[in-house]
């Protein structure tokens, strides 16, 4: 293909309709037909990136290989497509404005008055085409965050309008995702919210090419005809997106509805072969027909909101399917764990994952959880802060340093077994300043980590400021907590493990970010397998 084609996905009526899942599902189908496809997300908030956002407000912050702190939708894109994303795949209003203001300060606008149109919209359009101009992709799908009609989204909607016009016929299309609610009192689906949403989009100068309708009930042919007539689309372009039991069913549902076929027709592209979803459907079959069930505790600080640990929960789905096992993830708030109730909270579980996080709140509960699973031979997996808690717990209860701590929690601790990284000590800005992105790790032979990975050197994604303090490495090693993975350049300990334990591993990095449907992460796969063994015993 000579020219990259563009698909824009907008949303109406309400937020959280699943634009990201629809975009990822369409991309999966187009990828399955042989088209090189990527997805990008444009977020209307003024933060430069979501790295400093409270997890309760935004859900997890997803990290790419190149160290970008991004929206959690990029995790969905990677999990569906099995292709890495980058900084270019996520743009925020804050980043756009920052770039334009920096250009103005450098004098790049030749003294002109800088305005939303054309300067902000031109910046948005340039970023929308950045991946397309790389030559790596046939089709670029762009998800516009927010809801049509929101004041924050207006510059993006205007940019889409201009870009579709500039690209010319068959080179750019708009998919509008909307809600068709069911009124139980009337016993029928109502199309009026969708009609008004499309009308709002048209007032901005954009005609939707395809309508994707989220619904709890089947759309009748009459209803589809009505939507087509009043929303000015062809009947074949009215796509039903009925509620599914798992997001991984959505590509098949969109295939049945013909979303990819309609999109290709609008873009004047050949259908090529039918999408190859053989491996995807094998995964789905394993997911829906498990042979056993395990209960794994997720000990964290933000467990009230599932999106805070989105990638971890999805990684358990991938690992569960790989083991033909249903993984029941039981959320346990670390603030609610203490020495008196830890057995009641964790005693019946088949495994415990101590989750990542920041700050002092709930720390003692995490440390108590690590102690209990270590002493009772329950499979343990610690990620980032969870790994650091295992080091603190071991230092306190095995080395006898009762006041061992991280300098994040206590700057004056006499035993800082977890310490601020040297390169972080003079940094004052919070945004984008952590140790971020993919870093190498050398794995020692004859260790649990080596059995899991089967490789000498791995690359994993990081997001942290604090690290294992190597001053205590010899003592911890002699006492049994092995450092089995180390960064080859800095000597930073990345993996710790216990030898005489069914499964005990802590990692400084975030393996959940690299788990996909096609490649479940090996630590999660082995952790679930260990939980299965524990359950059988």
Swiss-Prot record:
Coiled-coil regions, chain positions: none
GO MF, any single term: identical protein binding
Keyword ATP-binding attributed: yes
Substrates-to-products reaction catalysed: UTP + L-glutamine + ATP + H2O = CTP + L-glutamate + ADP + phosphate + 2 H(+); L-glutamine + H2O = L-glutamate + NH4(+); UTP + NH4(+) + ATP = CTP + ADP + phosphate + 2 H(+)
Enzyme Commission designation: 6.3.4.2
Residues holding CTP: 15, 150-152, 190-195, 226
Record-level GO BP terms: 'de novo' CTP biosynthetic process; pyrimidine nucleobase biosynthetic process
Pathway info: Pyrimidine metabolism; CTP biosynthesis via de novo pathway; CTP from UDP: step 2/2
Active-site residues annotated for this sequence: 384 (nucleophile), 510, 512
Pfam families: CTP_synth_N, GATase
GO terms for cellular component: cytosol
Domain Glutamine amidotransferase type-1: 295-537
Region (Amidoligase domain): 1-269
Positions contributing to L-glutamine binding: 56, 357, 385-388, 408, 465
Positions that bind ATP: 16-21, 73
UniProt enzyme class: ligase
CDD domains according to UniProt: CTPS_N (cd03113), GATase1_CTP_Synthase (cd01746)
Keywords: ATP-binding, Glutamine amidotransferase, Ligase, Magnesium, Metal-binding, Nucleotide-binding, Pyrimidine biosynthesis
Binding site for UTP: 15, 190-195, 226
PANTHER family, alphabetized: CTP SYNTHASE, CTP SYNTHASE-RELATED
Subunit structure: Homotetramer.
Family the UniProt entry places it in: Belongs to the CTP synthase family.
More about this protein: CTPSs have evolved a hybrid strategy for distinguishing between UTP and CTP. The overlapping regions of the product feedback inhibitory and substrate sites recognize a common feature in both compounds, the triphosphate moiety. To differentiate isosteric substrate and product pyrimidine rings, an additional pocket far from the expected kinase/ligase catalytic site, specifically recognizes the cytosine and ribose portions of the product inhibitor.
Function: Catalyzes the ATP-dependent amination of UTP to CTP with either L-glutamine or ammonia as the source of nitrogen. Regulates intracellular CTP levels through interactions with the four ribonucleotide triphosphates.
Listed name of the protein: CTP synthase
Source organism: Flavobacterium johnsoniae (strain ATCC 17061 / DSM 2064 / JCM 8514 / BCRC 14874 / CCUG 350202 / NBRC 14942 / NCIMB 11054 / UW101)
Gene coding for it: pyrG
């Amino acid at each position: 293909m000579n020219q990259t084609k563009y698909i824009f996905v907008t949303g109406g009526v309400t937020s959280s309709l699943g634009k990201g899942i629809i975009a990822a599902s369409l991309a999966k189908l187009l990828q399955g037909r042989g088209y090189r496809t990527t997805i990008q997300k444009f977020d209307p908030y003024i933060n430069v990136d979501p790295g400093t956002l409270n997890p309760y407000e935004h859900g997890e912050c997803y990290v790419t290989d190149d160290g970008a702190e991004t929206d959690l939708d990029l995790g969905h894109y990677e999990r569906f497509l099995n292709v890495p994303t980058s900084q270019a795949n996520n743009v925020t209003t804050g980043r756009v404005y920052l770039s334009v203001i920096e250009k103005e300060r450098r004098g790049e606008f030749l003294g002109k008055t800088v305005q939303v149109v054309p300067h902000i919209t031109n910046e948005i359009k340039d970023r929308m085409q950045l991946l397309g101009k790389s030559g790596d992709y046939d089709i670029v799908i762009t998800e516009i965050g927010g809801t049509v009609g929101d004041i924050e989204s207006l510059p993006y909607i205007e940019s889409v309008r201009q870009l579709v016009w500039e690209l010319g016929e068959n080179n750019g299309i708009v998919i509008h995702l909307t809600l068709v609610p069911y009124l139980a009192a009337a016993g029928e689906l109502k199309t009026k919210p969708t009609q008004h949403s499309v009308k709002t989009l048209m007032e901005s100068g954009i005609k939707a090419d395809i309508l994707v309708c989220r619904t709890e009930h089947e759309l009748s042919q009459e209803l589809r005809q009505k939507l087509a007539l009043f929303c000015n689309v062809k009947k074949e372009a009215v796509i039903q997106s009925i509620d599914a039991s798992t997001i991984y069913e959505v590509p098949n549902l969109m295939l049945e509805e013909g979303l990819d076929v309609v999109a290709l027709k609008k873009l004047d592209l050949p259908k090529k072969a039918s999408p190859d979803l053989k491996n995807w459907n094998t995964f789905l079959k394993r997911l829906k027909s498990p042979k056993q069930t395990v209960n794994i505790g997720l000990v964290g600080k933000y467990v009230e909101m599932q999106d805070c640990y989105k990638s971890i929960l999805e990684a358990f789905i991938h690992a569960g399917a790989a083991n033909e096992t249903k993984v029941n993830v039981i959320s346990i708030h670390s603030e609610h764990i203490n020495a008196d109730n830890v057995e009641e909270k964790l005693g019946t579980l088949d495994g415990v994952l101590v989750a990542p996080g920041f700050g002092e709140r709930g720390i003692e509960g995490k440390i108590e959880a690590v102690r209990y699973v270590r002493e009772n031979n329950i499979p343990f997996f610690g990620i980032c802060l969870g790994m650091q808690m295992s080091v603190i717990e071991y230092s306190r209860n095995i080395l006898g340093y009762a006041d061992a701590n991280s300098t994040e929690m206590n700057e004056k601790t006499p035993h800082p077994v977890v310490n601020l990284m040297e390169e972080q000590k003079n940094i004052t800005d919070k945004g984008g300043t952590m140790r971020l992105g993919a870093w190498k790790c050398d794995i020692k032979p004859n260790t649990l980590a080596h059995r899991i990975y089967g490789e000498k050197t791995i690359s994993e994604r990081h997001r942290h400021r604090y690290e294992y303090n190597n001053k205590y490495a010899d003592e911890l090693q002699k006492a049994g907590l092995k450092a089995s993975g180390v960064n080859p350049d800095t000597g930073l300990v990345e993996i710790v493990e216990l030898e005489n334990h069914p499964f005990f591993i802590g990692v400084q990095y975030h393996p959940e970010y690299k788990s996909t449907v096609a490649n479940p992460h090996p630590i999660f796969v082995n952790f679930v397998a260990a939980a299965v063994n524990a359950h059988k015993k």
